[in-house]
From Swiss-Prot:
Enzyme kind, highest EC tier: oxidoreductase
Example GO BP: catabolic process
Protein family according to the UniProt entry: Belongs to the gentisate 1,2-dioxygenase family.
UniProt xrefs under InterPro entries: Cupin_2 (IPR013096), GDO-like (IPR047183), RmlC-like_jellyroll (IPR014710), RmlC_Cupin_sf (IPR011051)
Self-association and partners: Homotetramer.
Boundaries of every Cupin type-2 domain copy: 97-165
Name of protein: Gentisate 1,2 dioxygenase 2
Natural source organism: Aquipseudomonas alcaligenes (Pseudomonas alcaligenes)
Known cofactor(s): Fe(2+)
């Protein structure tokens, strides 16, 4: 049935429609094509860019205006205007916030139902305690704080530490399952570097891992190791093929978290490359370098620490502005969610 043949609310008698509303019901057909459009989703997510040079001063001012005791986490949320600023979504299922912690501050121990990660943007001396292990937070590091796992933050260095929070909060909130619980101070019961030492070399596992599968065995992915792996992978990747590595569970090869996927991209000097068009939405964060991105018909120049929203079903082309140095990007997407729901698609 074509859109033109669908009835409208105006076609219905006024008293009939008012009776439907009084009974907490509505007719589907007037809005059917809004919720089930032809061909592809009627996307509300816009390909917005948040420039770190614009957001950082406001984040630092938040540090002056609001003590951490009154904020729990001092965060500025990246809000996509297409989804409504008040909904605090960067895409339909992904939340992104930039969090500031100052020297000597701590964020109390807690756990929550949404899946979350921290990706460090700047600063030294920050740390996260997760599951009894103290994880240092250095620029570009990815720290997992899975659903229901205790974690707390602190800062033992100088100057501000800023990281990017990525959560599936819109999804969990949308199904009325979002909550958090405060806890007592964590006890350190693991030596520093335990999880990264256990899974340092690709293809090698602790022998005991052969008889068990841990949901979240690796909680910290150091950027220096990821960066080096990208360089080595680029050396054996033909020109014209995307240099992209996925963050995975080293025991199972599955994605790190149930609903969100994470990957790192290296754009070789002077490279322009098109990403696969997919059903999943995503977020790109610039770790090092500068360049430009075209999302459908929208073009943005980007530089270090900028963050960009990628709508579902979008055509994305990335370009490195440098002819001599690589550019590195961190990507968050909801492909794991799409796969579990049976709706994941890759388009030619």
């Amino acid at each position: 049935m074509s859109e033109l043949n669908l009835g409208t609310v105006e076609d219905l008698p006024k008293d009939y429609y008012e009776q439907l509303v009084a009974n907490n019901t509505l007719p589907l057909w007037p809005s059917l094509r809004s919720v089930l459009p032809h061909g592809k989703p009627a996307r509300r997510t816009r390909p917005v860019i948040w420039r770190y040079a614009d957001v950082r001063p406001d984040l630092l001012r938040a540090g002056d205006l609001t003590p951490i005791e009154k904020a729990e986490g001092r965060v500025l949320v990246l809000c996509n205007p297409g989804l409504g600023l008040e909904n605090m979504q960067v895409t339909g299922s992904i939340y992104i916030g930039l969090q500031l912690i100052q020297p000597g501050e701590t964020a109390p121990n807690h756990k929550h139902s949404p899946s979350a990660v921290r990706f460090v943007i700047e600063g030294k001396g920050g740390y996260t305690l997760v599951n009894g292990e103290k994880l240092p937070m250095e620029k570009g590091d990815l720290i997992l704080t899975p659903p229901g796992m205790w974690h707390q933050h602190g800062h033992e260095g100088d100057g501000p530490v800023v990281w990017l929070d990525a959560l599936d909060l819109p999804l969990i909130y949308g199904i009325d399952a979002s909550y958090h619980i405060d806890g007592e101070e964590q006890t350190l019961d693991k030596a520093a570097g335990t999880c990264t030492s256990r899974y340092r070399q690709s293809g090698l596992l602790p022998y005991s891992a052969l008889d068990r599968k841990t949901s979240f065995p690796l909680l910290r992915f150091p950027w220096q190791e990821v960066r080096e792996s990208l360089k080595q992978f680029a050396a054996v990747t033909p020109a014209g093929e995307l240099v992209q590595l996925a963050y995975v569970n080293p025991e199972t090869g599955a994605e790190c978290l149930p609903t969100l996927g994470f990957s790192a991209i290296m754009l070789r000097p002077g490279e322009t490359i098109r990403l696969q068009r997919r059903s999943a939405s995503g977020v790109l964060h610039v770790v090092e370098g500068a360049g430009s991105v075209v999302v459908d018909d929208t073009r943005h120049a980007f530089t270090e620490a900028d963050t960009l929203a990628i709508p579902t079903h979008a055509a994305v082309t990335l370009s490195n502005a440098s002819s001599t140095e690589p550019t590195y990007l961190f990507m968050v997407d909801d492909a794991p969610l799409h796969r579990k729901l049976g709706i994941y698609e890759v388009f030619s």
